[in-house]
Regions:
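Conserved GNAT acetyl-CoA-binding A-motif
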Residues: 102-116
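Acetyl-CoA-dependent GNAT
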Residues: 5-77, 82, 95, 101, ...
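Conserved acetyl-CoA-binding loop of GNAT-fold acetyltransferases
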Residues: 128-138
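Short, charged helix-to-loop "capping" segments that act as catalytic/coupling loops
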Residues: 112-128
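Short strand-loop junctions, especially beta-strand C-caps/beta-turns
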Residues: 79, 84, 115-117
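Short glycine/proline-centered loop/turn elements that form peptide/ligand docking sites
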Residues: 95, 119-124, 140-145
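Extreme N-terminal starter segment of soluble prokaryotic enzymes
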Residues: 1-2
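Conserved acetyl-CoA-binding loop-helix of GNAT-fold acetyltransferases
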Residues: 81, 87-100, 126, 130
Length: 145
């Protein structure tokens, strides 16, 4: 497994992986519009986005961040792991990469917005606290970097 900056050649494979990940969670698969143009929605704004690729260069995870305007904080976005690849440390490795990228760009705190209800998104609600995130209001967690 290798984590690398997103490139457009991974677009379709990443979108397919995200749809599979949502389906595995019992959600109706739909695509978030920001994933259709990572360059415009992340890189052109000074934000970052990564993918995790397996040994066959297939996308098995993704995630990025966007700075909160007027602050030294950023939201983590679209941290997804392919269902068959969960519990192998890929999510933790992606999160660490995202946090290192944030620190390198002067970001001092990371935030994450979690979906509702928590029972359907139990993995997210347990994943982030294991990595030092604490809830600061319902459905939102934060970590000082």
């Amino acid at each position: 497994m290798e984590i690398k900056l997103y490139e457009d050649r991974y677009r379709d494979d990443m979108i397919f992986m995200v749809l599979q990940a949502k389906d595995a969670l019992g959600r109706i698969p739909s695509i978030n519009e920001d994933l259709l143009d990572i360059k415009k929605n992340y890189f052109d704004r000074g934000d970052m986005f990564w993918i995790a690729a397996d040994d066959n260069d297939r996308v098995i995870g993704c995630g990025g961040y966007s700075r909160i305007e007027g602050t030294n904080e950023a939201f983590i976005h679209r941290l997804y792991i392919k269902a068959s690849e969960k519990r192998k440390g890929i999510g933790s490795a992606l999160l660490e990469t995202i946090e290192v990228g944030m620190r390198g760009n002067g970001i001092t705190a990371a935030r994450v917005h979690l979906d509702d209800p928590p029972e359907q998104w139990f993995e997210s609600y347990s994943f982030y606290p294991k990595h030092g995130y604490a809830e600061y209001e319902p459905r939102y967690m934060r970590k000082k970097l």
